[in-house]
Amino acid sequence: MNSWNINLEDMMEAGVYLGHQARKWNPKMAPYIFAERKGIHIINLTQTARFLTEACDLLFNTAKNGEQFLIVGTKYQAADLVALTAKKSRCHYVNQKWLGGMLTNWTTIKKRLKKLQELESLESINGFDRFPKKEASNLKRQLAQLRKYLGGIRHMTKLPDIVIIIDQQHELTALKECLILGIPTICFVDTDCDPDLTDIPIPANDDSRASIQWILNKLTNSIREGRAFSKNDSIN
């Protein structure tokens, strides 16, 4: 047990240790694999604890400085968990489809966010009623689309300082954009992933809801604690 209350028993219970089928492995994950059981790779939870602690320390210290975080997880097992934990920790999030250029084409995304704000303002005063039926319908459809894909980053005013990625394989486009821009990443890496592509790889089962939730809670709690520490510091 350590300062972030990361213990092996909890990780076992959440199924964090279960990797993919051995035949699907990435050899770069060898240092993080404990064994093979019935054709399934078993993740070394000591390594998971080590990197999760490192990630929590980084997030805590970064949150103290008031930095911005983005959580990306669009697979069905993760989508609602991403939204829930991100809102609790006041992080930005993407839990639907990742739109290419969300980070690398930030100027265009900012314009879309402005459009989202304009349409929501219009909706709040029943402004759609002023338009012909067909035009109002188009505007409502546009608003629904913008909310769906950009709702989680509506308050993002600049590129994030750190991006947390739930499934490296599933979110490869997002990861590549971070690499291009030099944005640090923390990634869940299952046994079929490439740990070299991320700044802090967390070896873990990225398919189990319990595993995703357990690790996400640790990461976002460290952000919340960092922000609380910052507030207390400014009061003293």
Swiss-Prot record:
Belongs to the universal ribosomal protein uS2 family. CDD domains: RPS2. It comes from Chaetosphaeridium globosum (Charophycean green alga). GO terms for biological process: translation. The keyword Nucleus does not apply. Keywords: Chloroplast, Plastid, Ribonucleoprotein, Ribosomal protein. GO terms for cellular component: chloroplast; mitochondrial small ribosomal subunit. It is found in: Plastid, Chloroplast. GO terms for molecular function: structural constituent of ribosome. This is Small ribosomal subunit protein uS2c. Pfam families: Ribosomal_S2 (PF00318). The keyword Ribosomal protein applies. Its main location: plastid.
